[in-house]
Amino acid sequence: MNPLLDVKNLYVRFKTPDGVVTAVNDLNFMLNAGSTLGIVGESGSGKSQTAFALMGLLAANGTVEGSAIFEGKELVNLPKAELNKIRAEQISMIFQDPMTSLNPYMKIGEQLMEVLQLHKGYDKQTAFAESVKMLDAVKMPEAKKRMGMYPHEFSGGMRQRVMIAMALLCRPKLLIADEPTTALDVTVQAQIMTLLNELKREFNTAIIMITHDLGVVAGICDQVMVMYAGRTMEYGTAEQIFYHPTHPYSIGLMDAIPRLDGNEEHLITIPGNPPNLLHLPKGCPFSPRCQFATEQCQTAPKLTAFNEGQLRNCWLPVEKFTL
């Protein structure tokens, strides 16, 4: 079976007054219909820029190289007119901040209906009915009444439900969720994750979940890609990454999760800071922060498969972390 999305050798670069920044460096992954990929890592690791590259939404100073094939069609450098046909209809995105992603001057109903009128050619009455139906699907109370309200009249969780409804209106085959639970309290986060799981099953939608919240990833994702400084550090199933991580960075992220059943007096952290992308360290970008770094790490390793479906970007032997 051919994957829904096949990304190969993806690079994203930005020209700045100080030089060229490589935000995404030789990224490779595949995604099947109805499955969920979690992309995790610290801020600045290239997670969001990967999504923007796929959607054709990079800043004006950004360029993309490589290949991203969606249902047999190359997305990289696709003409804007063709890309506009794919956006919303086949690939949709939930943006990072629900507080600012909605137009404050337009009623919620108008914003939802606009999507269907633009992409599906629906008349006003049909677009209204479909919008109410989707608000019901995302568990919005009194959906019909909410259509006549403005964004400032909604809580953060309700706005996020509106964003999810808007993204799913055209029944896309791929949904990219960029930090969909940012600024939401934990109870609302849990509701949103449950909702996405239900919608995935109902519409067979593939999801790319971009987040630094590992708890979110554990609850919804089938596959996980750990990114650092624009590169893939480790890739595998959620079970492999959470229970059998083999890259020092992945292990550091897992160890840094606070545990209710732990006896530690202090939180575990990864020493140091993420690198400046204009001045990356020689070789492995994580080596200055890695307690296991050797001289060999001054040469960049390659992403290598070592287990069924699991890959890592590290010189250290797997056995060092699996004993």
Task: Locate the predicted segments by residue.
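Conserved ABC transporter NBD signature motif
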Residues: 64-74
